[in-house]
Amino acid sequence: MALKKSSAQMVADARARIEEIETADLIAMVDDPSVQIVDLRDPRERERTGFIPGSFHCPRGMLEFWVDPDSPYFKDIFAEDRKFVFHCASGWRSAISVDTLNDMGFKAAHLKNGFSEWVKLGGPVETKG
């Protein structure tokens, strides 16, 4: 079965439309109270590799429901007046997610190259336990 559009093309299209934050810039903002970093990765990814201190975990499958004030799953954190920066491991899931959120009317940005580059560039990482 041939697809109309590949996942790589979806990511490229999304990245052309959204705000992308470079890793070094987000590392500099990690303690800024006006910025909320949101981790879209699976819980197992967070357990295995750690997470950005102060980040809020929102599993990708719940994102649209958690940001929608009319949804029974709405999370109050998304009503706060902050800059929301979403990330995943490589930037693919977060690019598509932020494109979807912007389409919904929720202003957001994403970490361009994801958590893997965050770790590579020495960004702070927290682990449980």
Go through each PLM region and give its residues.
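Rhodanese-like catalytic fold shared by cysteine-dependent sulfurtransferases
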Residues: M1-V35, P43-K83, W92-G129
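Active-site flanking residues adjacent to catalytic metal/cofactor-binding acidic residues
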Residues: V38
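Short, surface-exposed ligand- or partner-binding patches at beta-edge/loop junctions that are enriched
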Residues: H87
